Regions:
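Polybasic, glycine- and aromatic-enriched phosphate-binding surface used to engage nucleic acids
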Residues: 1-200
Length: 200
């Protein structure tokens, strides 16, 4: 649900108004209200200034993503979406034709395994959906020309897997190594060279 325009995420230039609990965005000539409780910061470098980051770049994003899941990674039920998040539900429903999975409608375009008529708005991929929620992490640029192991302490979501270009690394429970140490070790040119050799 990325082309021609993304559905789940938007940038700050699309926000036309902001209120205590909602933002109003402009999409396809219409304005939509999105509840802030379902929004998470989203790392997806699309502008020149956002690209070419390295390990010690300060991560910042002007993008937010609709995250219709609870902290355990369970999809928020459709009745709760309708009653507690009516603006977001109306927005997603307005884009039903682009979101409906193939297994729900023969007109569907997305591959979403196990989707039903009541879960049509779920993400196509859900692996590691909550693995890094409320967890400091390194965002790793998989296809970066320069080493990129950027520290994230702001709970930024990333697209990972496939050709997304990013994955995340967090400190293992019980590890004696601080995340900053892991970042420095991974960013070392010798370590990077070893990873290049092993990875090719």
């Amino acid at each position: 649900a990325e082309r021609p325009t993304p559905i789940y995420w938007f940038s700050s230039d699309e926000i036309v108004a902001e209120y205590a609990d909602t933002v109003e965005i402009s999409r396809d000539g219409n304005n939509y209200t999105i509840e802030k409780a379902l929004l998470r910061p989203y790392f997806k470098p699309t502008k020149k200034a956002e690209k070419g980051l390295n390990s010690y770049s300060i991560l910042a994003t002007d993008k937010q993503i609709i995250f219709p899941y609870d902290n355990n990674g369970h999809l928020i039920r459709i009745d709760e979406m309708q009653s507690s998040y009516p603006g977001t539900y109306a927005y997603l429903l307005a884009h039903y034709d682009r979101l409906v999975p193939k297994c729900v409608s023969r007109d569907g375009t997305r591959d979403v395994p196990n989707a039903t008529a009541d879960t049509w708005y779920q993400y196509g991929r859900t692996q590691a959906l909550t693995a890094f929620i409320n967890t400091p992490k390194l965002i790793v640029g998989v296809l970066s020309k320069e080493p990129m192991y950027a520290m994230d302490t702001n709970d930024i979501l990333i697209a990972s897997g496939g050709t997304a270009g990013y994955c995340a690394v967090s400190k293992k429970d019980g590890s004696p190594y601080a995340l900053e140490y892991i970042q420095a070790w991974l960013s070392n040119p010798i370590t990077e060279r070893i990873l290049e050799i092993v990875g090719s």
